C-alpha cells in the first residue's frame, strides 16, 4: 500500500512539473471567455502587476481573443522589417494613434484588417511610417500644394481626409479649424491637387446613412454617458451636437437636427434608451453575427469617467433606438 502511495505522489509531481514547464514555455496567451487577469497570472505563475506591465494594461479589463504576453519584457512600440508596430495604451483611439504616426485611421484599419473602431490596451497594431517628430511636422506643414474642396451634404473631415489621402488634423490645420463642424457649401483647403474618383461612399456611414457633422466643444457633464458618446463620435469624424441635453432627449433632438433614427444598429451609431430618470446612450463598437452588439459607455456599470464595454444580447437590442 505504501509503495502505491509513493508511486502516485511521483506521478502527480511529474504531471505538475510538466504542466508548469509548458506554462513557463509559453510567451503569449489568448484570452478565453470567462478568464480574468487573476486566473491568467495564476496559470503562468506571475503576478497581476507583472501581467499588466508586460501588456501595458492600466486596468483589469481584458477581452476574449485578446493576445497577452505572459513572459518577456514590457511591451513597447517596435520597428520591424514590415513596418512599425504600436502597442495600444489605455485612452488611445485609432484617430489619436493615426495622428501620432502621421497617417489616417482608415489606413491603420486596413493594415490590421479591422472592420470596426474597437481597440484595447495591449493590442499590437501595425502603423505606417514612424512617429512624427515636431520638427518633421513643421517641415511637412510648410510645403506642398493645396487645392480647394467644397463640402457636400453628409461629408465629414475624416471622409474628406480619406478622399485626399491626408489626415483630418492636417485639414483642420490648413483651414484654422478648432472643431469638427463643417457645413455644405463650405470651401476647405486640402493638400495636393485632385481627389480620387471614388468618393460617394465616403460621405456615408457604415449603414449607408447620411449624417450631419457638428464641430462643437463637449459641454456635456464630464464622465457621463453623453460625454463619452460625444467624444467617441468626434474621434471617428462624425461629431454631434453638444446641445441634446439628457440622454432621454437625444432621439428627439438628433431627429430635429436631421439624423436618421431607427432600430438597426451599425458600427459608430449611438444606442439610445429613455429608460431611467435621465435615459442612457452608448457607442456601438461592433455588431456581432448573432445580432448582439458590443458597446462602450460610461456611468453604466462603473463610476463616471470610467469607460466600460458591454455586450447587449440580440433580444435586448430591440429595446434601443439607434442614432446614425
UniProtKB/Swiss-Prot annotation:
A Pfam family recorded for this sequence: LysM
Keyword Repeat: yes
Segments forming domain Peptidase C51: 200-324
Assigned GO CC terms: cell surface; extracellular region
EC numbers on record: 3.5.1.28
Keywords for the protein's UniProt record, in alphabetical order: Antimicrobial, Bacteriolytic enzyme, Cell cycle, Cell division, Cell wall biogenesis/degradation, Hydrolase, Repeat, Secreted, Septation, Signal, Virulence
Official protein name in the record: N-acetylmuramoyl-L-alanine amidase sle1
Annotated source species: Staphylococcus epidermidis (strain ATCC 35984 / DSM 28319 / BCRC 17069 / CCUG 31568 / BM 3577 / RP62A)
Amino acid at each position: 500500500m505504501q509503495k502505491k502511495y509513493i508511486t502516485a505522489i511521483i506521478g502527480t509531481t511529474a504531471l505538475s512539473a510538466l504542466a508548469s514547464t509548458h506554462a513557463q514555455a509559453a510567451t503569449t496567451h489568448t484570452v478565453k471567455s470567462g478568464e480574468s487577469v487573476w486566473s491568467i497570472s495564476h496559470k503562468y505563475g506571475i503576478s497581476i502587476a507583472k501581467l499588466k506591465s508586460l501588456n501595458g494594461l492600466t486596468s483589469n479589463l481584458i477581452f476574449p481573443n485578446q493576445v497577452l504576453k505572459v513572459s518577456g519584457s514590457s511591451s513597447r512600440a517596435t520597428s520591424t522589417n514590415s513596418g512599425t508596430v504600436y502597442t495600444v495604451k489605455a485612452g488611445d483611439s485609432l484617430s489619436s494613434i493615426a495622428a501620432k504616426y502621421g497617417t489616417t485611421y482608415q489606413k491603420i484599419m486596413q493594415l490590421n484588417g479591422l472592420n470596426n473602431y474597437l481597440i484595447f490596451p495591449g493590442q499590437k497594431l501595425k502603423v505606417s511610417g514612424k512617429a512624427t517628430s515636431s520638427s518633421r511636422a513643421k517641415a511637412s506643414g510648410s510645403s506642398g500644394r493645396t487645392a480647394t474642396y467644397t463640402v457636400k451634404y453628409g461629408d465629414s473631415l475624416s471622409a474628406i481626409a480619406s478622399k485626399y489621402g491626408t489626415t483630418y488634423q492636417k485639414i483642420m490645420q490648413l483651414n484654422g479649424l478648432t472643431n469638427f463642424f463643417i457645413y455644405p457649401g463650405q470651401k476647405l483647403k486640402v493638400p495636393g491637387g485632385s481627389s480620387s474618383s471614388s468618393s460617394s461612399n465616403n460621405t456615408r456611414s457604415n449603414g449607408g446613412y447620411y449624417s450631419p457633422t457638428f464641430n462643437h466643444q463637449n459641454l456635456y457633464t464630464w464622465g457621463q454617458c453623453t460625454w463619452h458618446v460625444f467624444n467617441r463620435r468626434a474621434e471617428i469624424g462624425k461629431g454631434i451636437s453638444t446641445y441634446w441635453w439628457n440622454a432621454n432627449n437625444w432621439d428627439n433632438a438628433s431627429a430635429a437636427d436631421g439624423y436618421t433614427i431607427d432600430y438597426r444598429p451599425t458600427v459608430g451609431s449611438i444606442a439610445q434608451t429613455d429608460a431611467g430618470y435621465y435615459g442612457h446612450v452608448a457607442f456601438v463598437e461592433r455588431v456581432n453575427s448573432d445580432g448582439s452588439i458590443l458597446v462602450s459607455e460610461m456611468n453604466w456599470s462603473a463610476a463616471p469617467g470610467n469607460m466600460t464595454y458591454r455586450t447587449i444580447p440580440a433580444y435586448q437590442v430591440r429595446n434601443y433606438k439607434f442614432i446614425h
